[in-house]
A protein has these predicted regions:
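Short, low-complexity N-terminal intrinsically disordered segments enriched in polar/charged residues
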Residues: 1-32, 140-145
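A beta-strand edge to alpha-helix "cap/lid" segment located at domain peripheries
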Residues: 1-3, 67-145
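Hydrophobic pocket/interface hotspot
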Residues: 11, 26, 34, 55, ...
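Short, flexible active-site loop motifs that bind/organize anionic cofactors or intermediates
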Residues: 15-16, 49, 121
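A solvent-exposed, acidic/Ser-Thr-rich amphipathic alpha-helical stretch
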Residues: 27-85
């Protein structure tokens, strides 16, 4: 598991340095049947995001959807915690929606399930209200008056 943790830390570092444009290091960690899920699927996007994304080709579609709609402003890793078959990444991220130019910033948690040294499941937890606001799906708090 320590090797996976080190490779995961390197993948996040490359992702952050590229501002969300080079997911290749993540692909190297995936099992062929990886399942990518996001809290945003149900709470914000509904069926529009098309998740969960199952398999490496679907994972590519996931990252393509992000690249087409969002620009990473910054991201940082605060901790990577491993226990049994789970690895949890804890950090912060800021993204700008390319259509609305609104930003969403805040804590982010990714939960990875690992078997035989490969990621078989990934769950992303990020600010669903902030994402909906950046997409123009809900009004800014200050605009409600």
């Amino acid at each position: 598991m320590e090797e996976f943790e080190a490779r995961l830390a390197a993948a996040y570092e490359a992702w952050h340095v590229s501002r969300g444009r080079t997911p290749e290091r993540f692909f190297e960690l995936y099992a062929d049947d990886i399942e990518l899920r996001s809290i945003l699927e149900a709470s914000v996007y509904g069926e529009h995001l098309g998740g969960p994304f199952i398999g490496k080709s679907a994972a590519l579609a996931y990252f393509t959807a992000i690249a087409e709609a969002w620009e990473m402003i910054e991201a940082t890793t605060e901790a990577i915690i491993a226990r049994d078959d789970k690895v949890v990444w804890v950090g912060r991220a800021s993204w700008r929606n390319l259509k609305s130019l609104q930003t969403v910033s805040g804590p982010k948690v990714d939960v990875w399930t690992v078997r035989n040294g490969r990621a078989v499941d990934y769950l992303e937890v990020f600010d669903s209200y902030g994402t909906a606001r950046a997409l123009g799906m809900v009004a800014d708090k200050g605009a409600e008056a």
